[in-house]
Amino acid sequence: MKELNFLNIIKSTLDNSSFIGDDCAYLDDLDIFVTQDTLIEDIHFSLYTTTPYLLGRKSVSVNLSDLAASLSVPKYITVSLSMPKLTKDSFVSELYRGINDVCRENDIQVIGGDITGAENVAISICAIGKKQSKFLTSRSYAKKGDVILVTGEFGSSAAGLHALTQYLYADEYLLQKH
């Protein structure tokens, strides 16, 4: 996918694109941060290599990472779930159990979302956080020499998925990151 190319097209098309390009947007008038990530079956995860529970945990956690990078405290999420019509009730129950556990651990409330049909499972989380510092951080403020902090290793989830789907040996830690 040509993400940067698409972002440039979007920026040039929208009347106001000042928030486009960062993982997290700070809305000054509301004093909140907003982020959204989508996980799609067979691209970001495989149902052959993960459980619905772990998928639920991961779907929330990737958003919490974006909020943490912006120095904000997560407060609310919405969950949009797309899935095939033959999806079992137990899948939804376990997925939301994983979502709920991460929310409970971080004092986050699920405030809504959407459910729709699709060929494959896709889960999209919108997370809202409150500013916890007088400082704002974002890519647009970054400059040469800045210190960058991350909440995990870059590419470990993709590497774990690749190892699992290609039947390659990988350390258990890497497999769990998927």
Task: Describe each region flagged by the PLM.
Residues 1-178:
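Helix-biased detector of long, well-ordered alpha-helical tracts
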